[in-house]
Design a protein with these regions (language model features):
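ABC ATPase NBD coupling module
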Residues: 68-89, 94-95, 118, 124, ...
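Catalytic Walker B motif of ABC-type/P-loop ATPase nucleotide-binding domains
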Residues: 166-169
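ABC-type ATPase nucleotide-binding domains, specifically the catalytic core motifs of the NBD
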Residues: 15, 55, 81, 103-122, ...
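The feature captures the beta-strand-to-loop junction immediately N-terminal to the Walker
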Residues: 36-38
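H-loop/switch region of ABC-family ATPase nucleotide-binding domains
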Residues: 201-202
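ABC ATPase C-loop
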Residues: 158-159
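Helix-to-loop junction immediately C-terminal to a conserved catalytic motif
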Residues: 51
């Protein structure tokens, strides 16, 4: 399988604070990879570094074989346009949505490349096939939705671009267990024929049997990798 993501020797953080330490990670096309760990151990920082939203101290990141960004001297946001061009979609944790927009407007805002905007109606239909509860809510302001529905909109927005790598940051955070499992189940329906997915979670049990690999994360380092069926030994 082709490599979608190759992270090598990455150290990253916020200003002088280093959160990620000499981290290596390879994700191949068609893979679903779970990264599990407690809050504050670097899962979100890893996503932000890949997306160009925080500083690197050192290391390299290849997306589809192309170098993206280099050092902290570039500053956060300096190569995010390249990340978008290469096809990276980050689905942030929590309620990071535009409350004043309708569901339809919010979804369409995720079609930020010329090609995806041209095909936004088709992409939107694909999202609605996965998140069926949103079909009758297209003209409803996002701020009036339930927590589970808002999370569906947030993930759906990330699906609107022609992405090669999907990064979902704790998609079940703050949701009732039944709703969280439904959201996660829908997320896992995304076709990864020519793409890949990383899901960050605190609860390893949620990902067991649902992803190809589960990797533990502690103190900014990845450790304890196992197949999803053998992951009970991984400690958060």
């Amino acid at each position: 399988m082709n490599e979608i993501l190759n992270v090598k020797g990455l150290s990253a953080g916020y200003g002088p604070l280093r959160v990620i330490h000499d981290l290596d990670l390879i994700v191949k096309a068609g893979e679903r990879v779970g990264i599990v760990g407690l809050n504050g151990h670097g899962k979100t920082t890893l996503f932000y570094a890949i997306a160009g939203l925080t500083h690197w101290q050192r290391g390299s990141i290849l997306l589809n074989g192309k170098q993206i960004g280099r050092t902290r001297s570039q500053g956060p946001g300096r190569y995010t346009h390249l990340v978008v061009k290469e096809g990276i979609a980050i689905m942030p944790q929590g309620d990071e949505i535009f409350h004043g927009l309708t569901v339809e407007e919010h979804l369409d805002s995720g079609a930020y490349t010329k090609e995806s905007w041209k095909n936004r109606k088709e992409k939107r239909e694909q999202v609605l096939e996965i998140f069926e509860p949103l079909k009758n809510l297209l003209h409803t302001p996002v701020g009036k939705l339930s927590g589970g529905e808002r999370r569906m909109v947030s993930i759906g927005r990330g699906m609107m671009s022609d992405s090669k790598l999907y990064m979902a940051d704790e998609p079940t955070l703050g949701l009732a267990p039944k709703i969280g499992k439904g959201v996660l189940g829908a997320l896992l329906k995304i076709d990864l024929t020519n793409s890949a997915m990383i899901i960050a979670e605190q609860n390893v049990a949620l990902l067991e049997g649902k992803v190809d690999r589960i990797i533990g994360m502690h103190a900014g380092k990845l450790k304890g990798e196992a197949s999803a069926s053998l992951s009970m030994g991984i400690k958060n």
